[in-house]
Amino acid sequence: MADGLNMGSLTLNDSQHAPAPGGPPSGGRAAYIPPHLRQRQVNANGDGASAPPPGPTGGSWGGPRGPRGGNWANANAPDFNPRGPNGNTNTNSGWTATEAGRPLFNPNAYGNPGHGGGYAGASARGSGDGQWRDGKHIPGPPNPRLERELFGVPNDPTKQNTGINFANYDDIPVEASGHDVPEPVNTFTNPPLDDHLISNIALARYQTPTPVQKYSIPIVMNGRDLMACAQTGSGKTGGFLFPILSQAYQNGPAAPPPSAAGQFGRQRKAYPTSLILAPTRELVSQIFDEARKFAYRSWVRPCVVYGGADIGSQLRQIERGCDLLVATPGRLVDLIERGRISLVNIKYLILDEADRMLDMGFEPQIRRIVEGEDMPNVNDRQTLMFSATFPRDIQMLARDFLKDYVFLSVGRVGSTSENITQKVEYVEDHDKRSVLLDILHTHGTTGLTLIFVETKRMADALSEFLINQRFPATAIHGDRTQRERERALEMFRSGRYPILVATAVAARGLDIPNVTHVINYDLPTDIDDYVHRIGRTGRAGNTGIATAFFNRGNRGVVRDLIDLLKEAHQEVPSFLESIAREGSGYGGRGGRGGRGRGANATRDMRRMGGGMGGPPSYGGGSGFGAPASNYGGGYGGAPSYGGAGYGGGYGGGGYGNPSGSTGPSSWW
């Protein structure tokens, strides 16, 4: 029966079959010989090297059909030669040969097919990517599908557009301190920006730079370090992406370090030129999405790495090439230890939400990344720090990372936007759910509502309560998996679940368009956290409402809350004034751990007395509890936290306690 089997006009006895090497002639029954033994039998019979069956393009097993002639199954195949049969490398790989036989980086091949990581051959980058050729940036062809994914369509509710109060940004005061501060720009034009970046900015429908962008673009383009303190929602991400991408398009890729030579195939170790550090998974993902927008059709490859997600997929992304890396500190340290990322080529270091990273305990990892690895020193890189608040001690720590920097203070920094209408309601804990339902019924679900709670358990419980009350709600917090968090945020952004209950994990830096109402169901213990929470609405000139539930359990922030409301020209309820008068021990200006806003939380410390030489010393003098004009003790010498100030028992008038460490208003 087998003899009669016919497969597509071929039979087992088909005379068209090639005879087995050394076997009977055509037409007889041939004995089956496994492929890996056929060549051996040919050579044993002295018949020479007949052509093996054709293999896949690339020549991995079937003969010299691929560009490298690889044929590991052929005993007579030539030895593998990474420089090709003539001793030259494939120019598509980004390498050229020297007389000494060492390959050199060929920047003109950057972005060609088979050019991975900027240095070694890999898969083509795709139809939407550009190239660097003959010293020029060659943008890739348009990709309509990717364009819709990145930029949306006009009036897309999931994409942020400037709001009705955007023109009022011109009235926001800006203070830039430092010597030779460049003049601000007022439009997205060339110069100083690259034409390709300007076209991507137009695709994003951005028409006018925000105040922070007007100043940060020329500052960074002139090679200066920057510490930028800007009103939340004011375009800080564009403030650092625009200038570093523009310079990348104008200057091209950097040559790899000598240690990168010899890495063929996919690049195992990435050598990014720009590093952006941020505290949370959500924020780095958001920055990465923005980088993809403005790197569209360019040679620059953005990558993102963060904890809580599959490291394998992140490694594969890095292997395909990584020019701009967005990372959380913990995952970056992990990849450095694995030998998969080198910082030796870094030209730009950006710390976003820098104060939050230090508050969250990332200082050891940040110092290791900046000072303990192979990153160029402070004089050989540009360092940019962006945040909505820069308390005094954070500025002192940042001094170690910056050189000759410009301090940029835009608007009422560390404060709130007047685009946000703030309301404070006195609500006891047991009444919060009923008051919340009243608010939701009153305002409806026409916009997005973000509700902040303090604990993960409360986030789950409150979202379940709202669902039972027929309100479409979801929740995110630190115990949710990364996939669950991303799905919840996507459902919230799209409006399918217009109510999101969140812990502080979503408070900082997340840019969620069209959030019209923020409710602080549980007030935070730090006024800076309150600022960042309500900053999720009123972004990019849009207006929003922020409601806070306050009771005597929150009296620790009452004075800072009153000052903040007055600063933003908001109504101050009488019960806040009454509670503030009840005791002077609460509401001390220190905030959490001495990092409170105070009168100078957003001023350039170089313009205050005490000097800036040497590591910080917080001892001596009057301490942090003294009037703002008495920051005695200087900032020279080894770190010291003793004396009558910070950490020295909070003696005397320390830490906002007029009665000393043993008085009736003592913190202890």
Swiss-Prot record:
Residues 57-69, 584-597 have a biased composition (Gly residues). A motif (Q motif) lies at residues 186-214. Keywords: ATP-binding, Cytoplasm, Helicase, Hydrolase, Initiation factor, Nucleotide-binding, Protein biosynthesis, RNA-binding. Residues 81-92 have a biased composition (Low complexity). A motif (DEAD box) lies at residues 352-355. It comes from the Eukaryota. One of its GO terms (molecular function) is eukaryotic initiation factor 4G binding. It catalyses: ATP + H2O = ADP + phosphate + H(+). Residues 419-580 form the Helicase C-terminal domain. Residues 217-408 form the Helicase ATP-binding domain. Pfam families: DEAD (PF00270), Helicase_C (PF00271). GO terms for biological process: cellular response to farnesol; cytoplasmic translational initiation; negative regulation of cytoplasmic translational initiation in response to stress; positive regulation of formation of translation preinitiation complex; regulatory ncRNA-mediated gene silencing; spliceosomal complex disassembly. It is found in: Cytoplasm. GO terms for cellular component: cytoplasmic stress granule; nucleus; spliceosomal complex. Residues 1-96, 112-144, 581-603 are annotated as: Disordered. Belongs to the DEAD box helicase family. DDX3/DED1 subfamily. The Q motif is unique to and characteristic of the DEAD box family of RNA helicases and controls ATP binding and hydrolysis. ATP-binding RNA helicase involved in translation initiation. Remodels RNA in response to ADP and ATP concentrations by facilitating disruption, but also formation of RNA duplexes. This is ATP-dependent RNA helicase ded1.
